[in-house]
Amino acid sequence: MSRRRRAEKRQVLPDPKFGDLVVTKFMNYVMYEGKKAVAENIIYGAFDILEAKRKDQGPLETFHSALDNVAPAIEVRSRRVGGATYQVPVEVRPDRRRALAIRWLVTAARKRGENTMTEKLAGELLDASNNRGTAVKKREDTHKMAEANRAFSHYRW
């Protein structure tokens, strides 16, 4: 642990189109090398595709439902006890839940087979909002791992 004081959390401004802080966080995860305009075009393009594909729901609702479906409730953390390392299941804090969900969505989108990042992101968001896709599978695997190591839950922090 650092001996200095804890770093302050920086305030993020809401995105210009929807006025949503979570969309801005998502934009920052998509962004490479400080190119925010490129990340903005990718996300808004993906939202346009979502709007065309899902008439029953707006792109922002689809985005938030995708995030909710990917966010893990429980994860495992390594804990050393007497020479053995146990994978101890712990609940995930709300801010980490959102960060993991965003990270998994972006990673899964980058690995998809479509041509442009806009199409990849739209496809992954659509899949995640329908409870399928790589990001949702990652969440399921995390939950399975926690369930398998439930016997070590008494080693909590």
From Swiss-Prot:
SUPFAM superfamilies: Ribosomal protein S7
Role according to the record: One of the primary rRNA binding proteins, it binds directly to 16S rRNA where it nucleates assembly of the head domain of the 30S subunit. Is located at the subunit interface close to the decoding center, probably blocks exit of the E-site tRNA.
InterPro entries: Ribosomal_uS7, Ribosomal_uS7_bac/org-type, Ribosomal_uS7_CS, Ribosomal_uS7_dom, Ribosomal_uS7_dom_sf
Listed GO biological process terms: translation
Transmembrane residue ranges: none
PROSITE patterns named in the record: RIBOSOMAL_S7
GO molecular function term, any single one: structural constituent of ribosome
This protein's encoding gene: rpsG
Protein name: Small ribosomal subunit protein uS7
Quaternary structure annotation from Swiss-Prot or TrEMBL: Part of the 30S ribosomal subunit. Contacts proteins S9 and S11.
Keywords attached to this entry: Ribonucleoprotein, Ribosomal protein, RNA-binding, rRNA-binding, tRNA-binding
Coiled-coil features, chain-numbered ranges: none
GO cellular component, one term: small ribosomal subunit
Matches recorded under NCBIfam families: rpsG_bact
Top-rank lineage group of the source organism: Bacteria
PANTHER family xref list: RIBOSOMAL PROTEIN S7
Lineage: Bacteria, Pseudomonadati, Pseudomonadota, Alphaproteobacteria, Caulobacterales
Organism encoding this protein: Caulobacter vibrioides (strain NA1000 / CB15N)
Sequence similarity: Belongs to the universal ribosomal protein uS7 family.
